[in-house]
């Protein structure tokens, strides 16, 4: 065995475009080093020299978050399928690697090619959270790219000293790009599946022609769905923006694309990720019309995926990846009418693979026995529903379309199907909310406990979020004070003390106030964002960073002279709708907003009318299943709702526990060398288990709630240690030939893991740990 020791750091500045000396940067002294390895299962070699345009899609979060983001992986896969285009990935490194990069004057690098990010033509950032721009600035700084678009010069992209084009996409960038506009050369609005390849073609032609950066951006500005902030400036009122040159659209329409589930099979990371499963999108868009919900407004029309395409993607993806779990994704999964049929068909086809289906938060009014039967598997977990409000009046105001009877029926159905833990999401601070509505949350919990008592013990986990108004929603004109949030939280805490079996979790109000201030801001916030980042803001969605984040943001806001504006918003400065006459409300809602130039397809007048309906607690039906609400989306530009009729539900095969017979035990000697030494023991075991699934070997599983392969490793190697003679046992449900198993399993393992020997041992014999006598170690010592 050999302990890997990193050589002393180089004293010379590295070549800005050369492949990074990865082994000198990442070693066992770095926390969770395997997340930086790249070359995951599913990565294919790319020809750097042959590519006409080179992308790096960056997710401004740590690897475990970014690598499991479905949109990130889909766009990466699509770009790599386009001839002449190459796409790599990058993520925000943790603090220890960030410091090492700075110490060694090394630019942040992409995980596959391991080339510095300035070597790419285009760097794309996913912006899905109002405070996420601080992470983007941290990555730009680590990449040695100027923070502001205006500082990146006018050299052609083909020039070796030209910085990459920097762009943002994602829901936050689409809804209101103005607070972040100064940092980006362009913004990709809406769905990127078709838009990004088009951008790549324009960039490739501009590179070949030697166009300046300015001319290239002018060419990009005429691509539908591309917003170039430098070509737009404030209008006469200084709130909205308008084109600075002729020929540019006054309003920029977002792009809409059809979901492509076969691109979701993606990659299998070496480490455990936040969403450690195969995920396939079944429906894009939501037409429920919840008045607080920005994703529902930004993704219309609703588009169902063909059931057979979903089934094929899951079946093929589970075989390719070896995952034990899969998830079907949509803003409202239960509105995908084919869900029960697709779920049963998948359960039947994958019945012998010991897999579990998971769904995100669902509509409780559509949760029935058909959906309950397809959930879970050998590892049934809890369920999540989102009533949002505690009274019928307030649910009507927000257009939730949910009654107490729906809630009771859904929870009882869940309990009748074996679920005992249910998570419920509520919000406080919604427009029109009173103390009675807040206390109604506790009353709703009490009602559910009482109405379900005959079915056994019910455990409720309640998450209370603070409502923050979002652009392009009917509630974009509203605001609630921080003081009111705190008072209402305390009101609910007191009421919740009397409830047994109910646990309340509250969102920090400081975070909500900052999200609101930035999310509805304008271009004047760019220096505030930079100042907050320099003061220590970053990883702002993480609870551990909250105190530091709050101090950094409030300090930056005060230093910019915007504290008065921040406090006015915090005190409810926009929450005047209830007090206005109809004429006054019309005038109030017609005032310009910083995001008016972004055309989501929904008419601003319709949003104002829907706000009026909210004040009257009037409900608007779901236009996917009832009449058109005339929001303005459907038409030749954005298309129409695509709702697929539900197929017949197949007969479901009985659930069966994974096979646990112990017929044959094979002992393996293996080596773990090279980069695999950076893999922790738990990650190694997970890698072996997934490889076994891909090899489709007749393995034996343990019993109990969480069945696992009967795989035993003799020793857990310390992180960073290579092993040249490790041992493990694996048991099978039938007699197998050791050499054939070795060959079949080896085909599914990555370089650095080599099965060297295999032979049968008695099933009832001693375990490996009992038979170990000694281990031989060798150390390579290097002087600094």
What do these predicted regions represent?
Residues 1-44, 51, 55-57, 499-657:
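Radical SAM enzyme core and accessory elements
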Residues 92-241, 474-522, 529-545, 550:
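Glycine-rich beta-alpha loop elements in corrinoid/cobalamin-binding modules
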Residues 26-56, 63-64, 229, 234-279, ...:
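N-terminal [4Fe-4S]-dependent radical SAM core
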Residues 272-308, 630-643:
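Canonical Radical SAM [4Fe-4S] cluster-binding loop centered on the CxxxCxxC motif
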Residues 57-62, 122, 131, 315-461, ...:
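Conserved SAM/AdoMet-binding glycine-rich loop
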Residues 699, 705-784:
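Structured-RNA-binding interfaces characteristic of tRNA pseudouridine synthases
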Residues 57-61, 79, 267-294, 318, ...:
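N-terminal pre-triad scaffold of radical SAM enzymes
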Residues 84-96, 703:
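A short beta-strand-loop structural module common to alpha/beta enzyme folds
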């Amino acid at each position: 065995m050999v302990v890997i020791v990193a050589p002393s750091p180089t004293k010379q500045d590295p070549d800005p475009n050369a492949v990074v000396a990865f082994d000198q940067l990442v070693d066992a002294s770095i926390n969770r080093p395997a997340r930086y390895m790249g070359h995951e299962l599913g990565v294919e070699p790319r020809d750097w020299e042959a590519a006409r345009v080179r992308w790096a899609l960056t997710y401004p979060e740590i690897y475990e978050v970014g690598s499991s983001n479905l949109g990130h992986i889909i766009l990466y896969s699509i770009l790599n399928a386009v001839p002449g285009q190459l796409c790599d990935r990058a993520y925000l490194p943790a603090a220890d690697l960030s410091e090492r990069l700075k110490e060694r004057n090394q630019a942040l690098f992409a995980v596959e090619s391991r080339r510095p990010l300035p070597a790419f033509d285009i760097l794309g950032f996913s912006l899905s959270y109002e405070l996420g721009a601080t992470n983007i600035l941290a990555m730009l700084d680590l990449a040695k790219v100027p923070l502001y678009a205006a500082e990146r010069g006018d050299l052609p992209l083909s020039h070796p000293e030209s910085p990459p084009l920097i762009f943002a996409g994602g829901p936050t960038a689409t809804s209101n790009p103005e607070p972040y506009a100064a940092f980006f050369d362009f913004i990709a609005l809406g769905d990127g599946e078709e838009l990004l390849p088009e951008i790549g073609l324009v960039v490739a032609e501009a590179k070949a022609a030697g166009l300046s950066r300015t001319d290239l951006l002018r060419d990009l500005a005429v691509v539908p769905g591309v917003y170039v902030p430098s070509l737009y400036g404030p209008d006469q009122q200084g709130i909205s923006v308008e084109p600075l040159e002729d020929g540019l659209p006054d309003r920029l329409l977002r792009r809409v694309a059809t979901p492509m589930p076969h691109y979701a099979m993606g990659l299998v990371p070496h480490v455990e990720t936040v969403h450690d499963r195969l995920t396939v999108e079944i429906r894009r868009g939501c037409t429920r019309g919840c008045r607080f919900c920005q994703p529902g407004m930004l993704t219309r029309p609703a588009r169902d995926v063909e059931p057979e395409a979903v089934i094929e993607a899951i079946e093929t993806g589970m075989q390719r990846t070896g995952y034990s779990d899969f998830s079907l994704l949509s803003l409202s999964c239960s509105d995908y009418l084919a869900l029960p049929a697709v779920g049963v068909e998948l359960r039947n086809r994958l019945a012998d693979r010991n897999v579990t289906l998971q769904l995100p938060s669902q509509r409780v009014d559509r949760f029935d026995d058909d959906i309950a039967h397809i959930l879970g598997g050998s590892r049934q977990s809890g369920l999540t529903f989102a009533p949002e409000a505690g009274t019928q009046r307030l649910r009507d105001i927000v257009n939730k379309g949910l009654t107490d009877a729906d809630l009771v029926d859904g929870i009882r159905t869940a309990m009748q199907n074996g679920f005992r833990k249910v998570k419920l999401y509520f919000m406080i601070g919604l427009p029109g909310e009173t103390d009675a509505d807040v206390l109604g949350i506790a009353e709703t919990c009490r009602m559910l406990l009482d109405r379900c008592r005959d079915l056994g013990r019910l455990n409720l986990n309640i998450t209370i979020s603070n409502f923050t108004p979002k652009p392009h929603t009917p509630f974009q004109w509203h605001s609630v004070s921080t003081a009111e949030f705190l008072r209402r939280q305390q009101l609910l805490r007191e009421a919740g003390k009397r409830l047994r079996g109910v646990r309340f979790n509250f969102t920090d109000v400081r975070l909500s106030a900052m999200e609101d201030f930035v999310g509805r801001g304008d271009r004047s916030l760019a220096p505030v964002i930079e100042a907050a980042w320099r003061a220590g803001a970053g990883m702002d969605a993480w609870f551990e960073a909250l105190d530091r984040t709050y101090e950094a943001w409030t300090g930056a806001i005060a230093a910019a002279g915007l504290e008065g504006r921040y406090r006015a918003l915090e005190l409810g400065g926009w929450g005047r709708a209830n007090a206005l006459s109809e004429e006054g409300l019309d005038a109030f809602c017609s005032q310009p907003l910083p995001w008016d130039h972004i055309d989501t397809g929904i008419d601003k007048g319709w949003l104002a009318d829907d706000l009026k309906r909210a004040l009257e607690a009037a409900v608007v039906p779901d236009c996917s299943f009832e009449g058109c609400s005339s929001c303005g989306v459907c038409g030749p530009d954005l298309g129409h709702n695509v709702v697929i009729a539900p197929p017949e539900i197949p007969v479901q095969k009985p659930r069966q526990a994974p096979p646990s017979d112990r017929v044959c035990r094979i002992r393996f000697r293996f080596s773990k060398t090279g980069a695999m030494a950076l893999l922790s023991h738990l990650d190694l075991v997970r890698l072996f288990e997934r490889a076994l699934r891909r090899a489709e070997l007749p393995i034996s599983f343990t019993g109990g709630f969480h069945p696992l392969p009967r795989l035993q490793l003799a020793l857990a190697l310390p992180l960073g240690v290579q092993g040249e003679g490790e041992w493990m046992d694996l048991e099978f449900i039938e007699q197998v030939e050791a050499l054939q198993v070795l060959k079949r399993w080896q085909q599914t393992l990555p370089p650095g893991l080599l099965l060297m020997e295999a032979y049968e041992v008695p099933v009832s014999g001693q375990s490996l740990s009992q038979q170990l006598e000694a281990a031989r170690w060798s150390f390579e010592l290097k002087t600094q």
